[in-house]
Amino acid sequence: MSATDELRKDHKQIVRLEKVIIKCYTELYAGKNIPLSDMDKISLVIDEFLDSIHYSREEDSYFPCVASYDHLKQEIRALLIEHEFSRRIALQIKKYLKRWKEGEDVREPVARYLKTYSIFLIDHKTKEENFFDKA
């Protein structure tokens, strides 16, 4: 399996995460409760799979390899900036989950950042798929 195929396989798992995130923020906006343990699992998957595994594969291996194609350097830079944006959204989710655990009713910002994250994932995944076709 090529590196591109491996990253596309990751994207199939990311689609599953998108669906869970959408379900959670929809339920939160509807005033329903989501167990904090479930929210912690989402945060863990974002940290451990998306950031530590998927982004690492791209940033440490794939992008440096295809950066030799000069015409892709600008797109790689844009994708790296988006990875950092993703990390910042994830930090906000974690920050508000911590406050929620401490007893504050911060479901609205959690829902808002989850929605932002899901929109980001859909858009970013599409950009990466198009990038893989060019690489």
Q: For the regions a protein language model found, what residue spans apply to each?
A:
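Small-residue-biased structural context
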Residues: 1-135
